[in-house]
Amino acid sequence: MALGDPYATPDDLKARFDIATSDTVDDTRLGEALASVSREIEAYCERQFNTDASATARVFRPRSSGVVVVDDFHTTTGLVVATDEDGDGVYETTWDAADYQLEPLNGIVSGQSGWPFRRIVAVGSRPFRCDRRPSVQVTAEWGWAAVPAPVKEACLISAAEMFKLGDAPFGVAGFGEFGPVRVRMNSRAQSLLAPYRLHPVLVA
């Protein structure tokens, strides 16, 4: 799936309701629900899970002279790490692969494989330059190699709820004892997405 695509298809969602794939009456509403929920997942997790098929350049500020945290990228194919050595906005120095290490190592987080790279660690003699300007330019195929199964499931759970609610005006699903009940992300979906949040909320 390309960047910006929903994390599940209308046919996936139809299966939740035992709707035949040949029945296209609700395809528009199903697609809108999936697209809306997918963007909500991205906002909740502060990352996106699809794949950019071509390498593009992005710039970053290092956290220190030894580490720069970047957006998720899933392959070293087309990867270029370059730095601006004098703060002029020109990334004139291209690093050799031996100059840096990509993390998480082996694409494993908490025992689960399939995670993209997100940190670049300087392991040679060359440090990252820390400045007000972004001093590191990374050209990469951004995103994940595949949408994680829990993310797809969270998308389907929430999209199914949204589809069943229909056109809830102003996000109001109904009225309870204390007033209007607002539509919010399903708690099961939140649980599935918890490991993928960049900045999880800590509860004391």
What residue spans do the PLM features occupy?
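Divalent metal-cofactor coordination and adjacent catalytic microenvironments
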Residues: 1-204
